[in-house]
Amino acid sequence: MVDVGCFAQREGEIPEPGPEQALLRVLSVAIDPAIRGWLNERGSGYLPPLGLGEPVRSNGIGVVVRTTTEALPVGALVTTLTGWQEWALCCSDFSDIAKLGTVIPEGITPVEALTVHGQIATTSYVGVEVVAKPEAGETMVISAAASAVGSLVGQMARRRGALVIGIVGTEEKRSWVTDELGFEACINYRTDDIASSLLQLAPKGVDIFFDNVGGEILDTVLRRMAMHGRVILCGTLATSNSVEPYRLQHWERILSRRFSMTGFNSMDHWDRFPEATAAVTQWLADGSIKYRAHVLEGLDRAPEALVRLFLGDHLGKLVIEVADP
């Protein structure tokens, strides 16, 4: 388990941008489950693990202060993997996917960009509109339903007419997703039996499971999948701190119920970023989707925030404000 003692602050020189690069003054950084995977020796699978002494990799927002590319002009608000640092370089091409910078449209604040736009919007939008494609009347279950991605996915699925059931870990989160976001029901995995709850809430089975956590919750929902359903694998929050991988006990249901399991990453669909941003902006404006951010001030609180993420001690997207815009 990661604790705050695993991290230390260091000072370094501000880097100069190379060809097709921009220097960002970092304004905010997001605290995401993916960070934990990058801290493991084996990495996350799609980006290499971090070495000791390297800045923690993290999605962030910064303002361009120096640039060598017209695609990232001075003054632009840009999202990239800034890391836990006050200054960061990004690039305007795909020469380094981990440092690809994308300009955020005007009128969007740094916290909004990390909470409901950028990677969050693209992941949620692609997950629903391209991968899951819920249809009216289908039952869709979402784990980590009060998270930034989980809450958006649920609201987007409801817009398509799906019956949405969330899985969360506190009563406060359960109330938020049902009372404010409009989910049909929500299961508290700490107090409710997931299998029996799903039998009651979805007696004909689960058509779509959008999974952000993996582990035992994934294994349990597999038992309740409907014939020809689909499981969308988006995250492994429940097993990020595990030394040994969780071994599924109910994998045979994939065969007997003939449902599919699909893993996806928004990096494979970054060309949909403008489309996702436009859609989310419109849905925010017309009130059909809502969001919540849990903001902490100061880069020194980033380790604390990461610990809180895995304890579930927050409501909404965890964001660190590094500097004033």
Set out the residue ranges of the language-model regions:
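Glycine-rich beta-strand-centered segment in the early N-terminal region that forms part
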Residues: E11-I31, E41-W84
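NAD(P)H dinucleotide-binding glycine-rich loop of Rossmann-like/cofactor-binding domains
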Residues: V56-V63, P73-A144, S288
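N-terminal Rossmann-like NAD(P) cofactor-binding module of classical short-chain dehydrogenase/reductase
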Residues: T79, V141, I187, D207-F210
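Short, glycine/polar-rich helix-capping loops at beta-to-alpha or helix-loop-helix junctions
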Residues: E86, G169-V177, P245-W251
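Mid-domain Rossmann-like dinucleotide-binding core that forms the NAD(H)/NADP(H) cofactor-binding site
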Residues: L114-D192
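Short amphipathic alpha-helix with an adjacent loop that forms part of the alpha/beta core around
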Residues: D193-P203
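Glycine-rich phosphate-binding loop and adjacent beta-alpha segment
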Residues: E216-I289, V322-P325
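C-terminal capping/lid region of NAD(P)-dependent oxidoreductase domains
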Residues: S288-V295, P303-P325
